[in-house]
Amino acid sequence: MKVQIVFFSITVFIFVLFLLSVESNTKIKIVPSFLENSNEIEDLYINLDSDSKSSEHTTSSSSSSNSKNKGDSSSSSSNSGSSSNSIISGDSNSKDAPTTSSDSLSPATPIPTDGLLSASTYVTFTGGKVLCENITFCPNGYMYSSDYACNYDIVQNDPATHRGDWNDGIKMFEDPLPKNTTIDQVEGISFTISGAVGCQVTSSATTLEFYIQDLLVLTNTTSRYDICTCGSCYVTFGTEVYKYNMLGYNITGENKFQIQVSVNSMCATTIGITLYYKPPTITPTPTITPTPTITPTPTITPTVTPTATPSTTPSTTPTTTPSTPTPTPTKSPYSGALSPQVKKYIIIASSITGGLLISIFSFVFIRKRLNSKRSGYTQIKDGKDIDTQQIKIGVRIGKGNFGEVYLGTWRGSQVAVKKLPAHNINENILKEFHREINLMKNLRHPNVIQFLGSCLISPDICICTEYMPRGSLYSILHNEKIKISWSLVKRMMIDAAKGIIYLHGSTPVILHRDLKSHNLLVDENWKVKVADFGLSTIEQQGATMTACGTPCWTSPEVLRSQRYTEKADVYSFGIILWECATRQDPYFGIPPFQVIFAVGREGMRPPTPKYGPPKYIQLLKDCLNENPSQRPTMEQCLEILESIETKGFDDIPVNNNNNNNSNNNENNNENNNNSDNNNNDINYSNRVIN
């Protein structure tokens, strides 16, 4: 009987484990296990190719220089007005300067970049500043740079007057590819030149040869003429993307770059090198559902073994009468009724098993309740899978690169439904989509957009969030029918600061990385909520939401692909403060690729607003400081905003973006000196994100 009790207890215990495994497995099915180890933050890689193509043009200008770099090749030429590209795929045997005959060049065909990622780096040319120190502005369509270098001398064959550190066009650069990227993943390459090309107007064309590790990568022939009398005035153009086989390339360190100019001359400020590579292939790990093994309780058949056999043979003696004795059977150890001892064992085992079951189920229930609570906020259900048949889709209220946004009704409430287009679905997008859903469903704050649920069944992949009737802050600022007072701006910026502080205070720290007025949504009571912090990396794939695009709100350290902290979000918050004070687009009319260079390398900032509360204007300038450690924290921004006095200031009018960048150069000097003049005693601590 003891064996029965043991088998019964083991069976009950295995059944309990089965119940727990089913509960655990149900959770795993919501998010596949191969997505749980995804990287939290990806590096920002800037693809200048699409922007640089739009800036290609041909201009005419006179030049007094007729010489070229003595290290450049002069063996290739082209007819006036023509443009061609060639690439070389073989090895070079040259040990010093690269040399390649134009007869060996084969026509190159641009490759498509669909589905490819990109990583960029820059080489800079300096040393020509003294020649153009009196220049303050450039003609329309040209940018100004304080430093540059040229491939020819001011006075022919006079090395003493050489323009800058041209050095035969040779520069070294660090590999920009992400860690663990292999050579086999690299598909193509493109180059972006910021400078003046075609200085000798008497020549018909300019031939540019690009070398990496002394191997010719690309030959570009163009018939463009730019202003070359002063290298400080320049334009930016780029090549298309061509196949690159990475011969001789050092993927773990420094590489040698060289540009050779023939037939004509050029000046350069920077040259961008962009590599295009395939994303890594991720093999999903299948989810294994444990199958419990239940051992059936064996049926024990009782065996009755008599201890003695009664004698049936009569025993007789001559002197006695024979008699048949009555047999006395021995009592069987098994009987129909359980003995008191067996009943005692059964009661004890049942009590222990029942107590264990009650304890386990109580623990699971309490753990669920504790994990779901968020102190200080109204508890709602965690974001979960939604049956799209329960959603009534209404009118379209927005459209972006992520997909279309519709006003919908779900369980009697208005919701915003973002649908992922079927043609946009791939493994990387789904992986990022799952990761960001897991992030958003755990956030609860009055100034953070509420995530309600999602559908992950293709093709109806979508997410549902709360609906904000007044739309984005950007649309409000640019609506001439809406009057905006300084008190309303103060209130909305306080709301935004509280939402960002909540994200920065999370564990681990959540950096928005895409803060802008488009991602601050407003409800019917003018309360502002931070949105799109979860899907920013998806929506930024090749996206520009305005004529200027996301770079206008991005901090200089991010544009330079450097390490960044939560102070990068503080810089973006400063641009939003500027938008509210002016009701204009930052850097209106300047192409995004020029904004990237001007903000990241030249220190350009929007012009300081001339009207508004002094504390507000000073906070705006402090947030845009070049040095991240000199920027205030979001907690300090909130404290300053709450102390601002807005009485006596008129409503902020809508501006038409005219001349809002005319004072950029003057304003840049002021911004660059902020840390020296105003904030020498401030050194905010940073939490560095690798």
Curated annotation (Swiss-Prot):
<keyword id="KW-0067">ATP-binding</keyword>
<feature type="glycosylation site" description="N-linked (GlcNAc...) asparagine">
    <location>
        <position position="250"/>
    </location>
</feature>
<comment type="similarity">
    <text>Belongs to the protein kinase superfamily. TKL Ser/Thr protein kinase family.</text>
</comment>
<dbReference type="GO" id="GO:0005524">
    <property type="term" value="F:ATP binding"/>
</dbReference>
<dbReference type="InterPro" id="IPR001245">
    <property type="entry name" value="Ser-Thr/Tyr_kinase_cat_dom"/>
</dbReference>
<feature type="binding site">
    <location>
        <position position="418"/>
    </location>
    <ligand>
        <name>ATP</name>
    </ligand>
</feature>
<dbReference type="InterPro" id="IPR051681">
    <property type="entry name" value="Ser/Thr_Kinases-Pseudokinases"/>
</dbReference>
<keyword id="KW-0418">Kinase</keyword>
<feature type="compositionally biased region" description="Low complexity">
    <location>
        <begin position="296"/>
        <end position="323"/>
    </location>
</feature>
<keyword id="KW-0812">Transmembrane</keyword>
<feature type="compositionally biased region" description="Low complexity">
    <location>
        <begin position="655"/>
        <end position="681"/>
    </location>
</feature>
<feature type="region of interest" description="Disordered">
    <location>
        <begin position="287"/>
        <end position="335"/>
    </location>
</feature>
<feature type="compositionally biased region" description="Polar residues">
    <location>
        <begin position="97"/>
        <end position="107"/>
    </location>
</feature>
<feature type="active site" description="Proton acceptor">
    <location>
        <position position="514"/>
    </location>
</feature>
<keyword id="KW-1133">Transmembrane helix</keyword>
<keyword id="KW-0723">Serine/threonine-protein kinase</keyword>
<keyword id="KW-0472">Membrane</keyword>
<feature type="glycosylation site" description="N-linked (GlcNAc...) asparagine">
    <location>
        <position position="134"/>
    </location>
</feature>
<keyword id="KW-0547">Nucleotide-binding</keyword>
<dbReference type="GO" id="GO:0004672">
    <property type="term" value="F:protein kinase activity"/>
</dbReference>
<feature type="region of interest" description="Disordered">
    <location>
        <begin position="51"/>
        <end position="110"/>
    </location>
</feature>
<keyword id="KW-0732">Signal</keyword>
<dbReference type="InterPro" id="IPR000719">
    <property type="entry name" value="Prot_kinase_dom"/>
</dbReference>
<dbReference type="GO" id="GO:0005737">
    <property type="term" value="C:cytoplasm"/>
</dbReference>
<keyword id="KW-0325">Glycoprotein</keyword>
<protein>
    <recommendedName>
        <fullName>Probable serine/threonine-protein kinase drkB</fullName>
        <ecNumber>2.7.11.1</ecNumber>
    </recommendedName>
</protein>
<feature type="domain" description="Protein kinase">
    <location>
        <begin position="391"/>
        <end position="644"/>
    </location>
</feature>
<dbReference type="GO" id="GO:0007165">
    <property type="term" value="P:signal transduction"/>
</dbReference>
<feature type="signal peptide">
    <location>
        <begin position="1"/>
        <end position="24"/>
    </location>
</feature>
<dbReference type="InterPro" id="IPR008271">
    <property type="entry name" value="Ser/Thr_kinase_AS"/>
</dbReference>
<dbReference type="GO" id="GO:0016020">
    <property type="term" value="C:membrane"/>
</dbReference>
<dbReference type="GO" id="GO:0004674">
    <property type="term" value="F:protein serine/threonine kinase activity"/>
</dbReference>
<feature type="compositionally biased region" description="Low complexity">
    <location>
        <begin position="57"/>
        <end position="96"/>
    </location>
</feature>
<keyword id="KW-0808">Transferase</keyword>
<feature type="transmembrane region" description="Helical">
    <location>
        <begin position="346"/>
        <end position="366"/>
    </location>
</feature>
<dbReference type="InterPro" id="IPR017441">
    <property type="entry name" value="Protein_kinase_ATP_BS"/>
</dbReference>
<feature type="binding site">
    <location>
        <begin position="397"/>
        <end position="405"/>
    </location>
    <ligand>
        <name>ATP</name>
    </ligand>
</feature>
<feature type="glycosylation site" description="N-linked (GlcNAc...) asparagine">
    <location>
        <position position="180"/>
    </location>
</feature>
<dbReference type="Pfam" id="PF07714">
    <property type="entry name" value="PK_Tyr_Ser-Thr"/>
</dbReference>
<feature type="region of interest" description="Disordered">
    <location>
        <begin position="649"/>
        <end position="690"/>
    </location>
</feature>
<dbReference type="GO" id="GO:0106310">
    <property type="term" value="F:protein serine kinase activity"/>
</dbReference>
<dbReference type="InterPro" id="IPR011009">
    <property type="entry name" value="Kinase-like_dom_sf"/>
</dbReference>
